[in-house]
Amino acid sequence: GVRLVGSEMCIRDSDYTETVRSTEFYGTVFSSSGVRWVRPDTISTYVPDDGITVASHTYDNKGNPVEEPRQLYDTSFLSVKDKYSMFLGGNQPLGVVKNANNPDGPRLLIIRDSYADSLVPFLTPHFSEIHLLDLRYYKLSIADYIAQNGIDQALVLYSVPNFVTDSNLLWIAK
């Protein structure tokens, strides 16, 4: 999937240096399947985060907005079971990735589950901002969000099992 999208955006493997971060990754499907004889997968990173800032946006118990800095790759998660949270620091209702190296680029909204998180670093060179909404946690108007944040393009990206079963996709129409 990532290579197909990359080929459409003129992203070449030679543009990146692969860094293997973990050779002991078992994902959600492994955890829920009961199949235990498969070998673990590898987690690699490809994109340096120079000029890239990541922030998670949530609300405190009084409804006030709270911004928490994050990273494209948070390697502290490599020492816990949920290694996939290394990408963008795990699940969050709203995340914003800003690219200081492309301030005039378009703004992308990704409506997604965590499946999209590993793709985001490959998209960062092409956008000034990437806004990530997880409809399991984000319940405000998406149309208002698009208008308030000058979104130019949108992408819906889910794993297939989540896409076909997620009842929260109804929030797209709000």
Name these PLM-found stretches.
Residues 167-169:
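Short aromatic-enriched loop/helix-cap "lid" or pocket-rim segments at secondary-structure transitions
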